[in-house]
Amino acid sequence: DSANSCYQRDKNHPAILIWSCGNESFGGKTIYEMSQLFRQLDKHRLVHYEGVFSDRSYNDTSDMESQMYTPAAGIEKFLAEHPEKPFICCEYTHAMGNSCGAMHKYTELTDREPRYQGGFIWDYIDQSIYKKDRYGKWFLTYGGDFGDRPTDGDFSGNGICSVSYTHLTLPTSDQV
């Protein structure tokens, strides 16, 4: 069982604040049972699951409302209509290309709405890999650059920070 394995591996790790029942798996009884197992094993940490909005019959799966890419105005509206839980964006922007606009709307919402817990950016670090070309010069690679069948192409070439951690790559990086 993945929830028990996750718990046993990480139960004493001080950085674990919230247990997660997964990502983008929709809702349902199995995910709900995972949340119950986390609560049974650990009565002190919260449980998170993003897919509750797709199946409200298991609304108690997550201790907070969690959605992806909901506009700041939509979050504010949801909280006004549903005061019973705080709200967290498990993804609210995707740091790829010329993205991460309107981040200020989310930080402003944090100042206005105490039940808005903030959110997470996908991706923080560029996932490209360094490789030497035939002349010995290093370059960044991604899907298909190793003679393999390309997967998602340059989809991994993203992130707020460069793969070398030497600089921020997006104009909105200072807002993070």
Go through the PLM ranges and name each one:
Residues 1-168, 173-174:
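Extended substrate-binding grooves/exosites of carbohydrate-active enzymes
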